[in-house]
Swiss-Prot record:
This is L-rhamnose-binding lectin SML. PANTHER family: PROTEIN EVA-1 (PTHR46780). One of its GO terms (molecular function) is carbohydrate binding. It comes from Scomberomorus niphonius. The lineage of its organism: Eukaryota, Metazoa, Chordata, Craniata, Vertebrata. Keywords: Disulfide bond, Glycoprotein, Hemagglutinin, Lectin, Repeat.
Amino acid sequence: AVPTETTTTCDGNHVHRLSCDIGVISVQTALYGREDSETCIEGKSLQQISNTECSLLGAVDVLKSRCDGKKVCELSTNIFRPSDPCSDTYKYLQTKYNCFPAIYLVTCEHSVAHLHCDVGQVISVYNADYGRNDHTTCSYERVPSQIQNRDCSNPTSKVAESCSGKNNCTIEASNLVFGDPCVGIYKYLEVAYVCQYPSIV
């Protein structure tokens, strides 16, 4: 069985960071709110931590869409602020995730991604995202304005549509293929996939 990792981040513009040394992130559960009176209590009043039945609906969907299939995923707890489930309670974000054993590929904009499997195996795309989530990936010889937007994400099914079920596959990382989620920003394509033997029906 794949061990489950847990990351907990107290509220207040802190960075919630998930990462996998081997494989890619697969989010299992996510809580934004408060379910106990032990987590993130330093310097807080009893009133701020007494409500232990507070959770934001849909937090797990946000984490899955932003983090599944990536090696590293960072987001601010502030993204949940507009839909605060309990305004008087001091909250935290807690995510449980596994590191799913997949092949992880990054392709800079205008380059071509090559997905391939051993003979007899076919590609099964786990996740794909075209955009920019940090300042460092695909940043060589780029001016700062082209890599400044880190919150540019465009999960896409186009890689799965083009490549799933094939032994090998090429797809260009370009706005023509995926559209442009953030104009003027130099983007990259992240793909996580596994190779498997075709299921015999």
